[in-house]
UniProtKB/Swiss-Prot annotation:
This is RNA-free ribonuclease P. GO terms for biological process: tRNA 5'-leader removal. Keywords: Endonuclease, Hydrolase, Nuclease, tRNA processing. RNA-free RNase P that catalyzes the removal of the 5'-leader sequence from pre-tRNA to produce the mature 5'-terminus. Belongs to the HARP family. NCBIfam families: PRK04358.1-4, RNA_lig_partner. It comes from Archaeoglobus fulgidus (strain ATCC 49558 / DSM 4304 / JCM 9628 / NBRC 100126 / VC-16). It holds the Pfam family PIN_5.
Length: 227
């Protein structure tokens, strides 16, 4: 059966992928991953999709911020299939929707309790300090700490953006695998019965497929990369 994969932004930009493969920069890792995707398309008929315009816009904006060459954007437009998920036809089981609502509700309650704790802590700080600049310094540090904890509580394990949801909808529509390093996407991919591939493992998986083909041009390409 022909293999298809739907990529989110982290499939190209994941920091863990760069460390694991030894890439020096985001632009270098993006170029190499896109080259692998191109070879997989030409030699193995493996297609990699990206939800359009949501994830595509997110990814291109990310690459532009890092000053990547125009060649990378050309590769992206050539080898990633841009497709908008059919949001009106893709069917999601009611049990999944029900579970998601419960998860969000639980996180809202945890976020509220966390906010209450920090409000009480800030009140204690202002009560014992008189110097305005010192109060601002202490409260500023407390707010920064609260933001980090609140983000961890609210975002971990849920779909917190439209692009995240588009990845799952498109994968469901195409019966494709999902490539990402996002914990929320992973969790709900598993709930939907979708194949999930860690972003950091995706390049090596493609290399293994290609090496088993035994084509001289493919083997030579890998040898030149290692040199």
């Amino acid at each position: 059966m022909r293999q298809r994969f739907v990529l989110d932004t982290t499939a190209i930009t994941d920091a863990g992928l760069r460390i694991k493969e030894g890439y020096e920069s985001l632009c270098e890792s993006a170029a190499e991953v896109l080259d692998l995707i191109a070879l997989a398309r030409l030699k193995l008929d493996i297609s990699c999709y990206i939800p359009y315009p949501s994830v595509y816009t997110e990814l291109t904006s990310f690459l532009k911020r890092y000053g990547c060459d125009e060649e990378i954007f050309t590769k992206l437009d050539t080898w990633l299939v841009k497709k908008t998920p059919n949001r009106y036809e893709v069917k999601i089981p009611a049990a999944i929707f029900y579970e998601y609502i419960i998860t969000v509700r639980q996180k809202m309650n945890r976020g509220r309790r966390l906010a209450e704790e920090y409000i009480l802590e800030s009140s204690a700080i202002t009560a014992k300090l008189e110097d305005k600049s010192k109060i601002e310094e202490e409260i500023g540090a407390l707010i920064s700490k609260f933001r980090d904890k609140y983000r961890a509580v609210m975002r971990q394990g849920i779909l917190d953006s439209a692009p995240d949801l588009d990845v799952l909808l498109l994968a469901k529509e195409l019966e494709a695998g999902v490539v990402s390093s996002d914990a929320g996407i992973r969790k709900w991919s598993e709930r939907l019965g979708l194949r999930f591939v860690e972003a950091a493992k995706f390049p090596r998986m493609l290399k293994e497929y290609l090496k088993l083909m035994g084509s001289k041009d493919i083997v030579g390409w890998f040898e030149s990369e290692e040199d």
